[in-house]
Amino acid sequence: MAGIKQFDRDEVLDRAMAAFWTRGYEATSIDDLVQATGIGRGSLYGTFGDKRQLFLAALDQYWNTVGMEMFAELSDPDARHAIERMFDALIRRASNPKFPRGCLFTNTSLECPTCGDEIARKIAENMGQQETAIYQVLRKAQADGTLSQTQDARALARFFLGVAWGINAVNKSVADPGVFRDMVRVAMSVWDTAAAVQIDGPRMTEPRRRGDAHGSARKKVAVRRSVPHNSK
């Protein structure tokens, strides 16, 4: 229709998402969003409502694009490999200069006390979705015997999610993939430890006290010496 500027909603959301991701929610002004999206205030407000509603839509856009690209790796049938691939996707994004630093959800969670309850709920909801996705992979590993049933799958899911969010937080100031790989290597050693535990629990042996071996040897010698020799 003549006189009405047409635009692609997803493209506008991508641009708004990048602006929020780069500057943060509070620091991004309406003028910044107008400049980033290329549409006027009237169209911006008419389509998305206020800044808060646009930000909530940008969070959904982030999850449906950047976030899902990482968590799609969890579909790998090998559970351990699935977790590794999730981390690999995260490292690729974190070390790619075309993306802003950190993660829009992680960055916002650090800023969240000033963002309002609605945004805080959105962050918590997303964290729950991520935790559940990892948890399902771990439960599958327990079902096929590659992860011990004695392990707390929910706690492990929270641990791996914490490592992922930790990488995102570190990424605010560091883009070295070697740093992130070190974090992942240690995290995966936790998996290996959990996988190695037998169903009946780890086999524990009491450490031999220093001197026990020598003491046993002395006792054996004493016993041999106490046996009388037959006289001929």
Regions found by a protein language model. Name each.
Residues 57, 71-101, 153-157:
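Hydrophobic alpha-helical connector segments
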Residues 101, 106, 151-170, 182-190:
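Hydrophobic alpha-helical segments that form the core
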Residues 82-85, 97-121:
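Amphipathic alpha-helical segments used for helix-helix packing
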